[in-house]
Amino acid sequence: MLPITNSLTYIIPILIAVAFLTLTERKILGYMQLRKGPNITGPYGLLQPIADGLKLFIKEPIRPLNTSPTLLILSPILALTTAMLIWTPIPMPHALTNLNLGLLSILAISSMAVNSTLWAGWASNSKYALIGSLRAVAQTISYEVTLGIILLSILILTGGFTMQLLTTTQKHIWLLTTSWPLTMMWFISTLAETNRAPFDLTEGESELVSGFNVEYAGGPFALFFLAEYTNIISMNLLTCIMFINPGPTQHPELFLINLVTKTLLLSLTFLWIRASYPRFRYDQLMHLLWKQFLPLTMALCLLQASLLVSISGIPPLP
């Protein structure tokens, strides 16, 4: 009974946070476009995400005739499962599983999520969905390269792979202050990794064909939607832990308040960017990564590694 209770107390708060992030996004976009946003369902529109979720899950799932039924259903389930698994090593202030290679496991699980996008495009048996999924996979895999190198740079600085060590390292000074170019590139790469504006080429909502999920409706579409917003929150949580010190570990209640506040501010920045910037062209997206971010992150990674080696060679003061 206890493992089931633990799992529920771990999953339910994430799903509630995701539900209200969608409402926050619609409200922020509304006010930035000089309108109200959802304000009818419940007080101040607070019940809107619950109504939307119910509507999507009670709709009949439409399956085109030529699709691969097993893969079509498995893809959204895999997307949400991998999005949830990313949260297991994250300390809030205690992790669900205290892994020795916590940061690497997060990177590995997020890489697995690419399979769900590819499967969805393939199973739809539609050329538009397949082209959309290939484009999405190319974007996600490309930006994982810079995320991996930035992660390696941070590991070189902290000297370990655990999340707790990152918190201890930033006790006196944030890594944002010492590695701000890496932080900026990490933040922009997380935008691309989670398919958010101005990099939302994976699911161009304003386009005639939205992307890999063009054949999805109802419940399976809702699972993809939940996975996307879960990834947004988890990436911002990771950014907070890596660069802007989530808080004092000796005071668990302060740690949680600090972590949630900083993550919320980063998530609001994501929404603000969506309301402010137009979509990039695909060639600009790839040019930014392969010709600008990649050489710069590699140079900074080598600089940090060489600095540590050179400083360790300096004899101690008498």
Curated annotation (Swiss-Prot):
Localization of this protein: Mitochondrion inner membrane
Domain of life: Eukaryota
Annotated GO CC locations: mitochondrial inner membrane
BP GO annotations: aerobic respiration
Key words, A-Z: Electron transport, Membrane, Mitochondrion, Mitochondrion inner membrane, NAD, Respiratory chain, Translocase, Transmembrane, Transmembrane helix, Transport, Ubiquinone
PROSITE patterns: COMPLEX1_ND1_1, COMPLEX1_ND1_2
EC number, UniProt record: 7.1.1.2
Pfam families given in the database record: NADHdh
Bilayer-spanning residue ranges: 1-21, 71-91, 101-121, 145-165, 172-192, 224-244, 253-273, 294-314
Record-stated family: Belongs to the complex I subunit 1 family.
GO molecular function, one term: NADH dehydrogenase (ubiquinone) activity
Catalyzed reaction equations: a ubiquinone + NADH + 5 H(+)(in) = a ubiquinol + NAD(+) + 4 H(+)(out)
Function, in words: Core subunit of the mitochondrial membrane respiratory chain NADH dehydrogenase (Complex I) that is believed to belong to the minimal assembly required for catalysis. Complex I functions in the transfer of electrons from NADH to the respiratory chain. The immediate electron acceptor for the enzyme is believed to be ubiquinone.
Protein name: NADH-ubiquinone oxidoreductase chain 1
Membrane topology per record: Multi-pass membrane protein
